[in-house]
Design a protein with these regions (language model features):
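Eukaryotic intrinsically disordered, low-complexity regulatory linkers and tails enriched in Ser/Thr/Pro
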Residues: 1-118
Length: 118
């Protein structure tokens, strides 16, 4: 396959930003495929796209999503939970926001402070 054909195939691959509600949180993730599901009342999201850098800095939100959806080949989201689907030119940051405040939720592995005996 010629380099120009390969570049065209990459350009033809669509990218979607999908925003949906999950457990009282607003999830924003990226996917290569969004269609009406064969299950009535659901939207089918597949080809989830996550950051693939091998660097030392890891986005904890993206890592949480990757682990949460690692065994899912297709997400069937209830249509009433889908807030928005956008076709985008490039991938952005995956986010989890609090539904009420809209603030970004960052899952940090925090251990409780140790108790010292007095």
């Amino acid at each position: 396959m010629a380099a120009s054909e390969n570049g065209k195939k990459m350009a033809d691959k669509k990218l979607y930003k999908v925003v949906f509600l999950n457990n009282n949180k607003v999830y924003e993730l990226f996917s290569n495929n969004v269609v009406s599901s064969g299950l009535w009342g659901f939207v089918e999201v597949s080809g989830l796209v996550f950051e693939t850098s091998d660097g030392l800095v890891v986005d904890p939100t993206e890592e949480k999503m990757r682990q949460e959806f690692e065994h899912a080949s297709v997400l069937h989201l209830p249509i009433q939970s889908v807030l928005r689907v956008e076709e985008v030119a490039k991938r952005g940051q995956c986010l989890i926001r609090d539904r009420k405040s809209g603030e970004k939720v960052t899952p940090f592995p925090v251990s409780p402070p140790s108790r010292s005996s007095s």
